[in-house]
Curated annotation (Swiss-Prot):
Catalyzes the ferredoxin-dependent oxidative decarboxylation of arylpyruvates. It catalyses: indole-3-pyruvate + 2 oxidized [2Fe-2S]-[ferredoxin] + CoA = (indol-3-yl)acetyl-CoA + 2 reduced [2Fe-2S]-[ferredoxin] + CO2 + H(+). GO terms for molecular function: indolepyruvate ferredoxin oxidoreductase activity. InterPro entries: Indolepyruvate_Fd_OxRdtase_bsu (IPR017719), IorB_Oxidoreductase (IPR052198), Pyrv/ketoisovalerate_OxRed_cat (IPR019752), Pyrv_flavodox_OxRed_cen (IPR002869). Gene3D superfamilies: Pyruvate-ferredoxin oxidoreductase, PFOR, domain III. The lineage of its organism: Archaea, Methanobacteriati, Methanobacteriota, Thermococci, Thermococcales. It comes from the Archaea. Pfam families: POR (PF01558). This is Indolepyruvate oxidoreductase subunit IorB. NCBIfam families: IOR_beta (TIGR03334), PRK06853.1-6 (NF005326). It comes from Pyrococcus abyssi (strain GE5 / Orsay). Its EC number is 1.2.7.8. Heterodimer of the IorA and IorB subunits.
Length: 202
């Protein structure tokens, strides 16, 4: 595989950079060349955050070029649209369905699009595929809302064409999180896997 490009986005405090590092380490363990990049200075709580994970046999820069992302993994629906120009034709937008309305929406200066409007933009305007589910709800079910990022990663491992096995990713999570947090993260991962299988009829 020449290269596989992931753009991860959301708002500060959602664990985006942790997710990027977990996927990067998993790709490294799978034997790929890996580059992980992030946009600095934007990870204050509720500010927009973007990280890049690139891996394959032929990967050089850390930044994913526009129009080259195989997947946009978004922790917040509108954040997926903010960075939609990164998506390649036929790429996948996979998002947590739980919105965190931006300040402009809270102040009544803008309206928040419906999930159907977001889907339409992804599919019709950008020729992409769109999947959304409430990852936050599953993280709470697993035992801790901060594992939302792990729920999303678990789900991502089941999407068609994703090159990393669930086992590679789980291995990295086991050695990366504090020992007392391993069980809750494993539960979160498996709930994500299950949700994706149900959505994709696997």
């Amino acid at each position: 595989m020449k290269e596989y490009n992931i753009v991860i986005t959301g708002v500060g405090g959602q664990g985006i950079l942790t997710a990027a590092n977990l996927l990067g380490w998993a790709a490294l363990r799978a034997g790929y060349k890996v580059r992980v990049g992030e946009v600095h200075g934007m990870s204050q709580r509720f500010g927009s955050v973007i990280a890049y994970v690139r891996f394959g046999e032929d990967v050089y820069g850390a930044m994913v070029p526009e129009g080259k992302a195989d997947v946009i993994l978004s922790f917040e629906p509108v954040e997926a649209l903010r960075y939609i120009n990164y998506l390649k034709k036929g790429g996948l937008v996979f998002t947590n369905a739980r919105p965190i309305p931006p300040v402009q929406v809270s102040m009544g200066l803008a309206s928040y699009p419906s999930m159907e409007e977001i889907r339409k933009i992804v599919e019709e305007d950008f020729g992409g595929k769109f999947l959304a589910f409430d990852a936050e709800k599953l993280a709470i079910e697993a035992g801790n809302v901060i594992t939302t990022n792990v729920v999303l990663i678990g789900a991502l491992t089941q999407t068609p064409g994703f090159p990393l096995s669930a086992e590679h990713v789980k291995e990295v999570i086991r050695i990366s999180v504090p020992p007392k947090a391993v069980d809750v993260n494993m539960r979160a991962f498996e709930l994500g896997v299950k949700a994706a299988k149900e959505m994709l009829n696997l």
